[in-house]
Curated annotation (Swiss-Prot):
Recorded family membership: Belongs to the glycosyl hydrolase 3 family.
Other information: Gut bacteria supply the human body with energy from dietary polysaccharides through glycosidases that are absent in the human genome. Xyloglucans are a ubiquitous family of highly branched plant cell wall polysaccharides present in the vegetables we consume. Enzymes involved in xyloglucan degradation mediate the conversion of otherwise indigestible plant polysaccharides to short-chain fatty acids.
Organism classification: Bacteria, Pseudomonadati, Bacteroidota, Bacteroidia, Bacteroidales
Function, in words: Catalyzes the hydrolysis of terminal, non-reducing beta-D-glucosyl residues with release of beta-D-glucose in xyloglucan degradation, leading to remove the backbone 'G' units.
Record-level GO BP terms: symbiotic process benefiting host; xyloglucan catabolic process
pH dependence: Optimum pH is 6.0-7.0.
EC number: 3.2.1.21
Keywords from the named record: Carbohydrate metabolism, Glycosidase, Hydrolase, Periplasm, Polysaccharide degradation, Signal
Domain of life: Bacteria
Transmembrane found in the keyword field: no
Molecular-function GO terms, alphabetical: beta-glucosidase activity
InterPro entries: Cellulose_Degrad_GH3 (IPR051915), Fn3-like (IPR026891), Glyco_hydro_3_C (IPR002772), Glyco_hydro_3_C_sf (IPR036881), Glyco_hydro_3_N (IPR001764), Glyco_hydro_3_N_sf (IPR036962), Glycoside_hydrolase_SF (IPR017853), Ig-like_fold (IPR013783)
Protein name: Beta-glucosidase BoGH3B
């Protein structure tokens, strides 16, 4: 029975991949006739081996001379280039050599060598990809930006676009044309080890920031990526951020409506913006690995949207169908499943056996030449759009702004706008100059902690070595307040980076900062997490470490006021120490300029404007998102079944304080009664009633009062960030289409139903009414991204 079951599963994948799916949309990226002509010419003359090679991606270490590289610095192996490119015609390489960032000159030298080999052996350029996910993370001396979760906290689309544009420029300075970014997974489970890579828990924020990043990376024309731009790769398609266990790469159980309405939304928006590639979720949903899901890969993405971009696997995920997920008996069978499901390129990353397996499958009739040609066309199209056939590499002398002060200023602004003030009792902040400050905690003097993963290395563990030109929190406070006014006693420290256990802490020395407190006017305690990335970041307890919490409790006993600084990639449970602090600042992972940004904010030289991009839980069994269902937050029910359900959170989504105050008034709309085709134009007056200038993120929410499927508590629909001088009032305009208030019903169809809605902006509420029900018969609403 087991074998019969497997045969049915595989034949379903193989058979349906050849079934035509009706196109319901014009090409989401305009077709370039010249590029398509070139592709047809190549497909006619390429051998099967050459075609399959284009579908294969190998990590750089395979073609490196590792022994020499470890002694003298990174260099390639001509013998392995002969095998990988000469024999197997491999069309893509990825990753960072020796596991650490390289100088742009070293990148350019290596990629020139690779491209010369590829053009000589195949006549087709190689495409090289790296994970530059928060700035130029793998190019030394480049500009690092805050991690995605911080950029979400800025609620600043333009800042996200500028950051991606700078990252593209500096990535291209090393002749790298492809970045595996942005990350638009929804960070809806605080336990998840990759929560910090995306823009937060909300699908609209991820969609807006993802679109902004694509604009910055790729420029305006997806068919002609300029010399200062790169191809974006949206990841991880999709639903990666909600594993049932909370652990990375473990199964999810996502409803069809949530998949379409929320998890698909950022990818839909980015593809409509012209995103050229997508990387697939490594996990399993409702029993089926995403890499094997033809419906999601081919139908939803390629056919329904008429998208001609490239789908690439994540690391070793074809083999995982055999070795981990057990839906394939052999690795060869796994190749068959994923290629027929719609994968175009395999991030193998070590074995060229993928090429051998796929050739055999084609010769056996298990994978059609039609599917091969479609995949290869997508690879070639990406290379033509990048201009690689004309310029396989670039003159790095053109990139004279690399690592410039101009770029650094943008990164500093991003860090300042991303750090969130959560508590400020008695206006203890800002801290006046001349105060004696006791600085404590394991995160107070660490570039590794400020940066997080994907920073100079996968786990970010070498950041203290590679980021010495930048300021830790301690160094930044010394610069701001004078070293003579900073007393540094960490009390708790992390184990050496040579220890594989990122969470491990040394024996605490709490007595030292407690003794030093007598000399201080105020205590700043920097707590949180050490750096980690992906599965190594899995944990079993979301509560902050006992050592760190005990440090705060001991310091509180001194009677000196405490400012807690939370430097972490996910919200660790701290409910027992929050009441002990006068102020709390959540800086998350602000990267190389995060220490300077914090010093500016604590001193009042900059004003807080960040807002929470996720819901911060108070208890481990009270994990929730802001768009929860009504039954998750109920008062006590009387009778025999006497129970209640409470949303017990520490800080809500969208929350953030400032050194000034904002008053909202005059919320209005042009059409209080509307239908799906109407444009709704909301206006609201926002006044800075305080004494200092500030920036305010104006968030517009909707609440569907009654629907045929249980509606969410509330949903974010638009946002704008405005700058206001003291006493200044601005009228903020926020536009929606009536169809933006639609939802996906139990039947999987988009629907907007007659009935009442409430709109919220700041403390302002208003009522609007939909007077006409509409049900879409297309998979996606036919409304382009705003």
């Amino acid at each position: 029975m087991k074998n019969i079951k497997k045969m049915v599963l595989v034949s379903a994948f193989a058979g349906t991949c050849l079934t035509p799916h009706a196109q319901t949309a014009s090409p989401v990226i305009p077709t370039d006739p010249a590029i398509e002509t070139h592709i047809r010419e190549w497909l006619q003359k390429m051998t099967l081996e050459q075609k399959i090679g284009q579908m294969c991606e190998i990590t750089i270490d395979v073609v490196s001379d590792l022994e020499t590289s470890r002694k003298k610095g990174f260099c390639l192996s001509e013998a392995m280039l002969d095998t990988v490119i000469g024999k197997y015609k491999v069309g893509s390489l990825l990753n960072v050599p020796l596991g650490v960032a390289q100088k742009k000159e070293k990148w350019a030298e290596a990629i020139k060598q690779i491209q010369e080999k590829s053009m000589k052996e195949i006549g087709i350029p190689c495409i090289y990809g790296v994970d530059q996910i928060h700035g130029t993370t793998y190019t030394l001396d480049g500009t690092m930006f805050p991690q995605g979760i911080n950029m979400g906290a800025t609620f600043n689309r333009e800042l996200t676009r500028r950051g991606a544009k700078i990252s593209a420029y500096e990535t291209k300075a090393g002749c790298i044309p492809w970045t595996f970014a942005p990350v638009v997974d929804l960070g809806r489970d605080p336990r998840w080890a990759r929560m910090w890579e995306n823009y937060g828990e909300d699908c609209y924020v991820n969609a807006e920031m993802g679109v902004s990043a694509v604009k910055g990376f790729q420029g305006e024309d997806p068919n002609r990526i300029g010399e200062y731009n790169v191809a974006a790769c949206m990841k991880h398609y999709m639903g990666y951020g909600v594993p049932v266990s909370g652990k990375d790469r473990t199964p999810s159980s996502i409803s069809r409506s949530d998949m379409r309405e929320k998890h698909f939304a950022p990818f839909l928006a980015a593809v409509r913006q012209g995103a050229l590639s997508v990387m697939v979720n490594s996990g399993v949903d409702n029993g089926l690995p995403f890499h094997a899901n033809r419906e999601l890969l081919t139908e939803w993405l390629k056919e329904d949207l008429n998208w001609d971009g490239l789908i690439v696997t994540d690391w070793a995920d074809i083999n995982n169908l055999c070795t981990r997920d057990h839906i394939a008996a052999t690795k060869k069978e796994a190749v068959k499943i994923v290629i027929n499901a719609g994968i175009d390129m395999s991030m193998v990353p070590y074995e060229v056996s993928f090429c051998d397996y796929l050739k055999e499958l084609v010769e056996e009739g298990e994978v059609s030449m039609e599917r091969i040609d479609d995949a290869v066309a997508r690879v070639l199209r990406l290379k033509y759009r990048l201009g690689l056939f004309d310029h396989p590499y670039w003159d790095i002398k053109k990139y004279d702004k690399f690592g410039s002060k101009e770029f650094a200023a943008v990164a500093l602004q991003a860090a300042e706008e991303s750090e969130v003030l959560l508590k400020n009792d008695g206006n203890i902040l800002p801290i006046a100059k001349g105060k004696k400050i006791l600085l404590t905690g394991p995160n107070a003097n660490s570039m590794r902690c400020l940066n997080g993963g994907w920073s100079y290395s996968w786990q970010g563990h070498v950041a203290d070595e590679y980021a010495q030109a930048y300021h830790t929190i301690y160094e930044a406070l010394c610069e701001k307040y004078g070293k003579e006014n900073i007393i540094y006693e960490p009390g708790v420290t992390y184990a050496s980076y040579k220890n594989d256990n990122w969470w491990e802490e040394n024996k605490p020395e709490t007595e030292k900062p407690v003794a030093a407190a007598a000399q201080a006017d105020i205590i700043i305690t920097c707590i949180g997490e050490n750096s980690y990335c992906e599965t190594p970041g899995n944990l079993t307890d979301l509560t902050l470490s006992e050592n760190q919490r005990n440090l705060v409790k001991a310091l509180a006993a001194t009677g000196k006021p405490i400012v807690l600084v939370l430097n972490q990639g996910r919200p660790r449970i701290i409910n027992d120490i929050v009441p002990l602090a006068k102020a709390v600042v959540n800086i998350m992972l602000p990267s190389n300029y995060g220490g300077d940004a914090l010093a500016n904010l604590l001193a009042g030289d900059a004003n807080f404007s960040g807002k929470m991009p996720f819901t911060y839980p108070r208890l481990i069994n009270a994990l929730a998102t802001y768009d929860y269902k009504p039954c998750e937050n109920m008062g006590q029910m009387g009778g025999n079944y006497n129970y209640d359900s409470v949303m017990d959170i520490q800080w809500p989504f969208g929350f953030g304080l400032s050194y000034t105050n904002y008053k909202y008034s005059n919320l209005k709309v042009n059409k209080p009664t509307f239908n799906a085709d109407d444009e709704l134009i909301f206006t609201v007056d926002v006044t800075n009633t305080g004494k200092v200038a500030g920036k305010e993120s104006v968030l517009l929410f909707s609440k569907d009062l009654v629907a045929s499927s249980t509606p969410d508590n509330i949903r974010l629909r638009n946002f704008e960030k405005v700058s206001l001088e003291p006493g200044e009032t601005k009228t903020v305009t926020l536009k929606l289409k009536g169809s933006d208030l639609a939802f996906v019903g139990y039947d999987g169809k988009w629907r907007l139903e007659k009935g009442d809605f409430k709109i919220k902006c700041g403390d302002q509420w208003m009522d609007i009414v939909c007077d006409q029900t509409k049900v879409w018969n297309t998979p996606n609403k036919n409304t382009l991204h705003k």
